[in-house]
Amino acid sequence: EERYEVLKAEMASEFHRAAADGELVLKHGVADTLKLIRDKNIPCALATSTRKEVVTMELTNLGVIDYFDKLICGDMVERSKPAPDIFLKACGELGVAPENAFAVEDSYNGVRAAHSAGMKVVMIPDLVQPDAEMREKALIIFDNMDGFKEYIMKLVTA
């Protein structure tokens, strides 16, 4: 466990260095999807376990901070994912009932948290492919953000 904590701290340090140096890049399709959401006046929050100070810097460097109506960060809730707190707070801040909200997640704990909050979970796997539990908890799974963007376009034109 001590070795795990050391590795976790080293990873966090490298991540924050990359963020500060402007080395982080958006995944393909994210900016276009966020633009569509904004253009269609769909309320949008970011619910992340990362501290607000770091998130604000990252989103500013990436040029997407203005796409989010609310930022709900790990230092703003008592319990982190897989507890539903961060998603419930995001829905509350947006004034949207969880059952009427989508949560887009790439992690198992994020999917668990959003599902526990009663949200419609969209999984876009990153490092780990979905297992049976994730397939059960997610409303839909896309290979990439383009799939989710197309899904939104169908919903808003239906």
Identify what each model region corresponds to.
Residues 31, 35-38, 51-158:
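Asp-based, Mg2+/Mn2+-dependent phosphohydrolase catalytic module
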Residues 25, 46-47, 78:
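Residue-level "hotspot" positions that anchor or transmit function at local structural transition points
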Residues 1-32, 40:
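Metal-dependent phosphoesterase signature
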Residues 45-46, 123:
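Hydrophobic beta-strand core positions in alpha/beta domains
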